[in-house]
Amino acid sequence: GDLNRVVTFNYTQMFVGFQGRFQRYSEEPSTLINYWRNAYVQCLMPAHDIIRIYESNPEFSNRVNIAKIWKCYVLSQIAAVWGPIPYEYGLNGDIIVNYNREQDVYYMLFDDLKSAATALDMEGDVFTKDPIFADTSGKSDILKWKKFANTLRLRLAMRISNPAPDGDPVKAQAVVEDVFSDENLTMASDDDTALSHWGGLISAEGGDYNPLYYYAVYEKQKNIGTLPAFGETACYHMKPYSDPRLKVYAQPVVDKKDSDGTVPVHAGEYFGDTASYGGYGGESGVTIPGDNVHSKLTREDY
């Protein structure tokens, strides 16, 4: 999804494929807009509404605090991407809203996570169908929610552990010491991790497949023109020096093409792709001479 594309943007020049101008350092505003919209509206608003509607009702105390912890988690992700965010004043439907500084966001996250985790009652109310931390019956596992909140505090403390002005190591140390004053309330094993069930294999079913595997292997023939490939820049930084990493990150030209069974001229050799959407073709208006090696290669060969 969008989040995976945002992550792979860090590897421009090393990784080429899918679509658009990914390998050219150009902006993809629609992807970032969608990520903001999904996180801010679709993830934060339901949690915010639970808190707003039920916070004064003691029968919903645990569920409200679970919503607060989840809200903190999503806000921490948004702050990691965009920095300043409307932490205090957002989600109320105001057209104009004040943003909080990134460093202040972290301080508020520490306080809100600690408060919510402390307020969770092991014998209190639960969600009957908890999608994140559920017990064997599917209901909220309160202990795991406590552990998640405290462990998230540790992760956020690491984010601010750099020396000033880029961090606050004194605050980070204080948070770590406070959390580890009771290590039993931190995530310590695989059993403590979240287990989400998003549906079937394909995206239309909310599948939790690996997007690269699904795109390049499961639906290879459907996506043959835009298969992900190793980038030209990375390839030609490695190839002249017989860099052993080349065989790990790249694959040679195929011995035989799946599409038509032909044997490529440069089978077994390594090349980097500079392709744009639709397979190799370069920039608009640029013609590749017949003696250029790329003129004989197709998307399968990179």
Where are these regions (language model features)?
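A short, exposed helix-loop element centered on a Lys and neighboring polar residues
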Residues: 1-13
